[in-house]
Regions:
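Hydrophobic faces of well-ordered beta-strands that scaffold small-molecule active sites
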Residues: 24-30, 59-61, 88-93, 135-137, ...
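Acidic-and-aromatic substrate-binding clefts and catalytic sites of carbohydrate-active enzymes
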Residues: 34-41, 62-73, 95-101, 111-117, ...
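Non-transmembrane, interaction-prone segments in cytosolic or luminal domains
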Residues: 69-70, 74-76, 81, 134, ...
Length: 292
């Protein structure tokens, strides 16, 4: 584990004169296989074994139909992952809740999902119980400048609490973080109004590309702030997520310049994957074209 705030990943540095791996292990955001893990009666352990069998080494989790950690307690889920040869790096959780739209049927009485603003201590405690090294915000309300500012305030608290528990905090982007709102973007506001040693980004390479951003230019603008990546591709025609290497994201350009980003963990993600063959083909493409 790197010291808090370090921008040089441990996989870059050779130890005992040996040659260090060129890139981090291939990981998976298991949201990709939510249709399996969230199915009624899903055999979590068996599905994790299938994930390991396609060459995945590290995983992230996300809330789904079976609840947090796919119906398991954090420690139990962590043991399942470890037993199948997987390392559980972090879990996605929402940030600042969006204000529900007014409607004839009030949503005020409905229980609100756990989120960083309201449940940060519980979320960090769960991550610690599972042995995770990262607390990750999956998305947050950022449609107004006020929401952007309040989101940044929540992230400051999350970064502080994660550090106190020997973990780190990161924010996962979509396209909307790059929209101009009153002359600023949520992406720039968060990165320039939080401590670079406590608040990091999990850069979704596909959504950044879809927003017209060059990930390498972002690395240069904010060096060391991107220790986590979502390795996602987008179909050249439809713009929808597709297996890595079959779409329009320039992964060779991005990986070649990865050192500047401070990347430590990379997670394949494919929204709408139809079966485990989709991430399996992404793993194979990366091994053949990037990790060779």
């Amino acid at each position: 584990m790197l010291a808090i705030g370090s921008s040089i990943p441990n996989w870059i540095v050779a130890r005992d004169s040996s040659i260090a791996p060129k890139y981090p292990p291939v990981g998976l955001q298991v949201y990709t296989l939510g249709f399996l893990l969230n199915a009624p009666g899903a055999d979590t352990r068996s599905i994790l074994k299938q994930i390991a069998d396609i060459g995945i080494k590290e995983i992230e989790t996300a809330t789904g139909g079976n609840g947090l950690y796919y119906g398991q307690k954090p420690k139990v889920f962590a043991e399942m992952a470890k037993d199948t040869g997987l390392k559980w790096i972090g879990n996605h959780i929402g940030g600042l809740p969006r204000t529900p739209a007014a409607s004839a049927t009030s949503t005020a009485a409905r229980p609100r999902s756990r989120n960083l603003r309201d449940n940060i201590q519980e979320i960090v405690d769960d991550a610690a119980e599972g042995g995770c090294s990262w607390v990750i915000c999956s998305s947050s309300a950022i449609s107004t400048l006020d929401e952007i500012k309040r989101t940044a305030e929540v992230f400051v608290k999350a970064g502080d609490l994660a550090e106190q528990n020997n973990m780190r905090f990161a924010y996962h982007n979509h396209q909307s973080e790059f929209d101009q709102i009153e002359g600023v973007t949520a992406f720039d506001y968060v990165l320039t109004n939080t401590d670079k040693k406590k608040v990091f980004m999990e850069l979704d390479l596909a959504w950044a590309t879809a927003a017209g951003q060059d990930p390498v230019a972002l690395f240069k603008k904010y060096p060391g702030r991107f220790p986590l990546w979502h390795v996602k591709d987008l179909d050249k025609t439809t713009g929808r997520p597709c297996p890595v290497g079959t779409g329009k994201v320039d992964f060779k350009h991005i990986f070649t310049n990865s050192k500047l980003s401070g990347v430590e963990h990379t997670f394949i993600e494919q929204d709408g994957a139809k079966n485990i063959d989709d991430p399996a083909s992404s793993v194979q493409w990366l091994k053949n074209n990037i990790y060779k």
